[in-house]
Amino acid sequence: MRGERGRGRGRFGSRVGPNTGFRPFVPHIPFDFHVCEMAFPRVKPAPDDSSFSESLLKRNQDLAPSTAEQASILSLVTKINNVIDNLIVAPGNFEVQIEEVRQVGSYKKGTMSTGHNVADLVVILKILPTLEAVSALGIKVVETLRTQDPAEVLTMLTNETGFEISSADATVKILITTVPPNLRKLDPELHLDIKVLQSALAAIRHARWFEENASHSTVKVLIRLLKDLRSRFPGFEPLTPWILDLLGHYAVMNNPTRQPLALNVSYKRCLQMLAAGLFLPGSVGITDPCESGNFRVHTVMTLEQQDMVCYTAQTLVRILSHGGFRKILGLEGDASALATEMSTWDGVIVTPSEKAYEKPPERKEGEEDENQDIPEGAEEEESMETQE
């Protein structure tokens, strides 16, 4: 009976009973140079990164919304916000009771990019969110706006998350949710999907957390650059906007000195952490600060997606270390093939990393599941097979 004295992984061991047959899940911490920099004293001066820093700022300048875009989206958001505020204060005969309206998303956070002039508002209803109520609110808002300014051409479309109002060069998406006690009273046939409502409430929590913790300008610039990176490299597509927000904040602010790192250092650090397996199964990852229960944000991705993010980052880290930053940043033509095809940098050939995860073959009917006794907590750690 070897189970009496724990042989499991982890600092405290594990007490495995004779009939349990599983090990507790102990996440590992991927290597991050900036957390343990004192253990690696420099033997030569740091390389000159001024050209890389200039390129990052140039790319951010290219990606930032123009003055005209900012003015048009601000104007539309302000008008819609005022109309909804008036409905809250003085609804009159209007039956759709509103609790509050909040700005969320990249508009609120200051991480919008040019060419995507879309802002998000969350409207919290006091009543149950029926499709009729959503449509009535959308019609009421757009008709009020048209009355205020008949010359402005506006369109209103309802969708599964609420509705959106568009002018010639800006769009405001209104995400509908309800007060939390109403979530228990929903009828799937009459009301908006509960996942949509919960997602809108989460967006409010995200915006509030960002405002309190991630308002540093370096964090905002880095997030805009990461969103651009995600849009140009298919391997990063699984990274959600919220994951990118948290990754950007972590890379800039999470270090022993608690002082924000420079943009060039933070950008490299993002790729280095992803390449080291920050978002792989078994990794401690980044805990969602807006959810309870130590939820690690990368677990929303499938195992294949987690592996794809890792091996894409590994390839880009190697290219970055050999001076290929202009190509990675999108300053020198299309770079989407960089992560999948061999490239040469100053005589050094960089071969793309290969995937490590192989999807297990589907079981035929009647076959028993060998892992059926493994509890849920240990599943993730056991389920990623690697090819040595």
From Swiss-Prot:
Region (Disordered) residue ranges read: 349-388
Protein name, entry field: Interleukin enhancer-binding factor 2 homolog
**Database matches in InterPro entries:** DZF_dom, DZF_dom_C, DZF_dom_N, ILF2, NT_sf
Entry keyword annotation includes Cytoplasm: no
- What keywords tag this UniProt record? Activator, DNA-binding, Nucleus, Transcription, Transcription regulation
Q: Which GO terms describe its molecular function?
A: DNA binding; double-stranded RNA binding
Any Pfam family the entry gives: DZF_N
Q: Name one GO cellular component term.
A: nucleolus
Q: Where is the DZF domain?
A: 23-370
Where is the chain membrane-spanning? none
Q: Where is the composition biased (Basic and acidic residues)?
A: 355-366
Role description: May regulate transcription of undefined genes.
Which Gene3D superfamilies would you find in this protein's record? 1.10.1410.40, Beta Polymerase, domain 2 (3.30.460.10)
State the organism named in the record.
Xenopus tropicalis
| Disulfide bond positions | none
Name where it's found. Answer: Nucleus
Acidic residues bias locations: 367-388
Q: Might you name a Gene Ontology BP term for this protein?
A: positive regulation of DNA-templated transcription
**Assembly with partners or alone:** Forms heterodimers with ILF3.
